[in-house]
Amino acid sequence: MNQGKRVGIIGAGNVGATVAYSLAMLGSCHEIILRDNKIDVAKGKALDMSQAAAAVRSHTIVSVAEEMADLTNCDVVVVTAGSPRLPGMSRDDLLMINANITKDVIAGVAKYSPDAIIIMVSNPLDAMTYVALKESGFDRSRVIGMAGILDSARMASFIQEKLGYGGGQIRASVMGGHGDDMVPLARYSTVAGVPLTDLMSTSEINEIVIRTRNGGAEIVGHLKTGSAYYAPAKATALMVEAILKDTKQIHPCAVFLEGEYGHSDVVSGVPVMLGANGAEKIIEISLDESEKIMFEGSCNSVRTLIDTLNKNKFFDKGE
């Protein structure tokens, strides 16, 4: 059904490679093209994945783009490229470094795969999605950030752990930015259709909300030398599949807002309908006053990052 579909993945580290592996095992597309500065590493991973695909009789080919020019005519491009935060590096330093990496990468995507849908995974996620949108010149429906599916999955996992039942039947809902200011919505979270608020006390729900906000940091604390990649990669692969298969399913994703939820010129996580044209529709759900305040705070955190980029003349042309 998906013969001929091409997916480019820029950044073949843990997240990028695991996205590729997940898609290859499912046979979601005809070809996956890895692009990484470490070309030999990318080639080794591509060979390994191609052989794994052969083992499960998947038709998917995994190849390597030695140059951006080899990343042509992709239907979807996943961007995971970026620098981790190193000792002595401020958050603003990291923001500028990754914004410049994103700018370079997106210029190549816009040139060689001008009809692609871009899925951003690089951090800080919401700000990098904003950069990708501005630098590509694409319609906002074709530049989407991966965050909400991951954060919702983390919340669902914590709910199952706390309850001790309901695995596979939990629908957790998270909005807002991918960070400390995300907005987990217990009111819209259910277990087999039963509202979470009927199954847990307010204090238990608050514990889960706090743990969800710190979900990534909790994993880093255990790993010591790395960060999460299985769940982020699976969340990304789900987005790719929804687009390639034109499922029209609703998923929480980071998109550019133009008045939705009362906010504009900012990227934040909201429910969207994913299909062949990307984020085809933004779903506006009703929020109570406290949820609106939390969502506004989340958007303002992203605006602070955008302001930092503007102060550094990042978007000025010709410099």
Swiss-Prot record:
Binding residues for substrate: 85, 91, 123, 154
Q: Name one GO molecular function term.
A: L-lactate dehydrogenase activity
InterPro entries linked to this entry: L-lactate/malate_DH, Lactate/malate_DH_C, Lactate/malate_DH_N, Lactate_DH/Glyco_Ohase_4_C, Malate_DH_type3, NAD(P)-bd_dom_sf
What catalytic activity does the UniProt entry give for this protein? (S)-malate + NAD(+) = oxaloacetate + NADH + H(+)
Question: Which residues of this protein are catalytic?
Answer: 178 (proton acceptor)
What is the enzyme's main class? Answer: oxidoreductase
**Mind listing the UniProt keywords for this protein, alphabetically?**
NAD, Oxidoreductase, Tricarboxylic acid cycle
Q: Under which EC number(s) is this enzyme classified?
A: 1.1.1.37
What does the record list as GO biological process? lactate metabolic process; tricarboxylic acid cycle
Pfam families, per the entry: Ldh_1_C, Ldh_1_N
Give binding positions for NAD(+).
11-16, 36, 98, 121-123
Give the record's family classification. Answer: Belongs to the LDH/MDH superfamily. MDH type 3 family.
- What role does this protein play? Catalyzes the reversible oxidation of malate to oxaloacetate.
Q: Name it.
A: Malate dehydrogenase
- Phylogenetic placement of the source organism: Bacteria, Pseudomonadati, Campylobacterota, Epsilonproteobacteria, Campylobacterales
Name the gene that codes for it. mdh
